[in-house]
């Protein structure tokens, strides 16, 4: 029957302990709020009466359960928690003492060796201890604890004091080590984020040895990491001295990665206002920062400190309840769903099933999101400047009277209906670089960090282009119809039509990933414009007296001059943009063809911009790993972008 038992626990650690106990013939049979039944191989099933439970909290870093032993009828307190906390709560034992004290000292020393060995293996460690109480002692404690629970003022402090009175003078029972395996793809994701220029801090509640082992396992720290260690008693003056002595620990251009490892006690002083600046100066010289034995409050304080003082965008990712405060404080919070529960997911902005998906979320979707927003904002500026300036140029010919050469309903629907959907589709579906390329070249993510898609000169060039197109869109029809007897709306109709074609075709030129959805929306916008103009022109007899747009579109669709004006205006307005984009693509194709030809002939070609970028990636990767010969090989054989990138890939191994 025991083999068919299935346990549900609050955390994987709890379940692992129960399953391990069952493997040693100590099987949990049932659990109710009042009692626990355990089946022992030697004595059979025993029922323990549950008297009280002190749940885990991040301040105490432990939990306790009070039971009545079924054989001795004694009140026993069992406590498990972090080894650094439990060891301080043990009863004082002297190596020169009597039998029990000496035995306890031997157990403590042996357990400490086991803990150190577990930590070096990357296991999550816990210590387990117990305390036997008399009924009188327990009744006295329970009465005071009840007063603390019912207190209105300082309730949290009173409960903490009550727990401290119970959890002291403990007898050590032993320690446990639970394997916490890295998920698939974690080292590769960490390495990709490093290449993308993202600085990673590891905030964990594990002990230092475990945290360092995990940091090495997930490539957060490389094998060439230069370790700078200094012992300290965690006093503020000594922390300040340590910061001054180690700044800068490693020159940033030395090719080595400097890492900072700091424990929770030292971090408590480093987060003090007088030391915050020095602490951040020290971390600025380190590519990796590992904060171990950190409480949930300290995690959130570190995120607040980095976010407020360094003025950077922060992202926090976690999978447990201890990470909730950190996730909520960061600019972007990501929760990893899994066995740790759903608290982190519920508190996050985004949720992923595994850590490895973070690299695609940032490098691919983050890059796309940035370029889409940047390009869409630029396009909205361009669209409005290009169209509104038509009214501006017209004011020079109407005495700045404020009149318009088109009906106000057309002006309203031009932005509201005819040209609103294409920019949205552009901002949702645009992909300037394929997902495969972004994953293979994490360095491309740096373009978003440097705001290369929305630089000041890009903005002003876009506005100048919009001014030029508005000039062409206005004056080509103006000089075409100059001297004719057309009215104001007959003159404005070619302007609106040409402006629509120019704005939509400009979007096609700028888009790098046209789909059938783009073409469907653009075609629908054009058809809706002509349909509205025809219906509105047929119905609007007295819309805007004394002149009215009555039957204007119907007459123009039969006039060859109208088509000639629209086509000529569109071509002249978009010619500079088309030539600029075409020249850029032609230059890229020519560079690729030259590289391929030189690659076949065995000559080293003159690298283009893309090739230089790929070479720099290979060079920086080679230097980062300390392999200068590989760096030289990447430079000597960098015939093309693909070749240079392939030379860089071995750096990853």
Curated annotation (Swiss-Prot):
Record has Membrane as a keyword: yes
Domain of life assignment: Eukaryota
Binding site for Mg(2+): 319, 323
EC number: 7.6.2.1
Keyword Cytoplasm on entry: no
Processing after translation: Autophosphorylated at the conserved aspartate of the P-type ATPase signature sequence.
Residues that, per the record, bind ATP: 14, 56, 80, 124, 204-206, 259-266, 293, 299, 322-323
GO cellular-component term (any): plasma membrane
Family matches, as Gene3D superfamilies: Calcium-transporting ATPase, cytoplasmic domain N, HAD superfamily/HAD-like
PANTHER family to which the protein is assigned, alphabetical: PHOSPHOLIPID-TRANSPORTING ATPASE VD, PROBABLE PHOSPHOLIPID-TRANSPORTING ATPASE
Homology family: Belongs to the cation transport ATPase (P-type) (TC 3.A.3) family. Type IV subfamily.
Name this protein carries in UniProt: Phospholipid-transporting ATPase VD
């Amino acid at each position: 029957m025991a083999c068919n038992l299935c346990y549900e626990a609050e955390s994987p650690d709890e379940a692992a302990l129960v399953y391990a106990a069952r493997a040693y013939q100590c099987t949990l049979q049932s659990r109710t709020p009042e009692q626990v039944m355990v089946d022992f191989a030697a004595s059979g099933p025993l029922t323990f009466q549950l008297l009280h439970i002190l749940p885990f909290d991040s301040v105490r870093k432990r939990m306790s359960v009070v039971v009545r032993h079924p054989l001795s009828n004694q009140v026993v307190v069992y406590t498990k928690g972090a080894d650094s906390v439990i060891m301080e709560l043990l009863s004082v034992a002297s190596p020169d003492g009597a039998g029990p004290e000496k035995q306890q000292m031997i157990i403590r020393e042996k357990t400490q060796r086991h803990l150190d060995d577990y930590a070096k293996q990357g296991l999550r460690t816990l210590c387990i201890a117990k305390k036997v109480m008399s009924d009188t002692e327990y009744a006295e404690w329970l009465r005071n604890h009840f007063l603390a629970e019912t207190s209105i003022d300082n309730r949290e402090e009173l409960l903490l004091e009550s727990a401290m009175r119970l959890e002291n003078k403990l007898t050590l029972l032993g320690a446990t080590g639970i394997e916490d395996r890295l998920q698939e793809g974690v080292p590769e994701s960490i390495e990709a984020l490093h290449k993308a220029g993202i600085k990673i801090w590891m905030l964990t509640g594990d002990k230092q040895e475990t945290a360092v082992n995990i940091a090495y396992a997930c490539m957060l720290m490389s094998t060439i990491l230069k370790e700078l260690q200094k012992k300290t008693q965690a006093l503020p003056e000594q922390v300040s001295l340590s910061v001054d002595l180690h700044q800068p620990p490693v020159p940033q251009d030395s090719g080595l990665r400097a890492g900072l490892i700091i424990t929770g006690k030292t971090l408590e002083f480093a987060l003090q206002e007088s030391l915050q600046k020095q602490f951040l100066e020290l971390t600025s010289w380190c590519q990796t920062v590992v904060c171990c034995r950190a409480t949930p409050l300290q995690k959130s304080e570190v995120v607040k400190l980095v976010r407020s003082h360094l003025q950077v965008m922060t992202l926090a990712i976690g999978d447990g309840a201890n990470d909730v405060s950190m996730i909520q404080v960061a600019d972007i919070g990501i929760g990893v769903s899994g066995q740790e529960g759903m608290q982190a997911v519920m508190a996050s902005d985004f949720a992923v099933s595994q850590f490895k998906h973070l690299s695609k979320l940032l490098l691919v979707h983050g890059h796309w999101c940035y370029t889409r927003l940047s390009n869409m904002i630029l396009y909205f500026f361009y669209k409005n400047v290009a169209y509104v300036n038509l009214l501006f140029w017209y004011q020079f010919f109407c005495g700045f009277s404020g009149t318009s050469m088109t009906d106000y309903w057309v002006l309203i629907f031009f932005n509201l209906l005819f040209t609103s959907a294409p920019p949205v589709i552009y901002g949702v579906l645009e992909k300037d670089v394929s997902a495969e390329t972004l994953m293979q070249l994490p360095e491309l993510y740096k373009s978003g960090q440097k705001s290369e898609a929305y630089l000041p000169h890009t903005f002003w060039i876009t506005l100048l282009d919009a001014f030029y197109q508005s000039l062409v869109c206005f004056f080509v029809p103006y000089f075409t119809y100059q001297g004719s007897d057309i009215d104001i709306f007959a003159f404005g109709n070619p302007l609106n039509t040409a402006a629509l074609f120019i704005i939509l075709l400009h979007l096609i030129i700028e888009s790098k990933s046209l789909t059938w959805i783009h073409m469907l929306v653009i075609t629908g916008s054009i058809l809706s414009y002509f349909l509205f103009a025809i219906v509105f022109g047929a119905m609007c007899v007295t819309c805007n007296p004394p002149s009215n747009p009555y039957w204007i579109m119907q007459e123009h669709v039969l006039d060859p001059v109208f088509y000639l004006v629209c086509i000529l205006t569109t071509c002249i307005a978009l010619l500079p943009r088309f030539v600029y984009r075409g020249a850029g693509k032609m230059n890229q194709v020519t560079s690729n063809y030259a590289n391929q030809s030189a690659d076949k002939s065995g000559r080293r070609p003159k690298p283009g911009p893309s090739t230089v970028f790929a070479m720099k990636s290979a060079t920086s990767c080679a230097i980062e790993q300390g392999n200068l010969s590989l760096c030289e090989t990447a430079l000597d054989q960098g015939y093309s972008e693909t070749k240079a990138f392939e030379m860089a890939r071995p750096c990853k191994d």
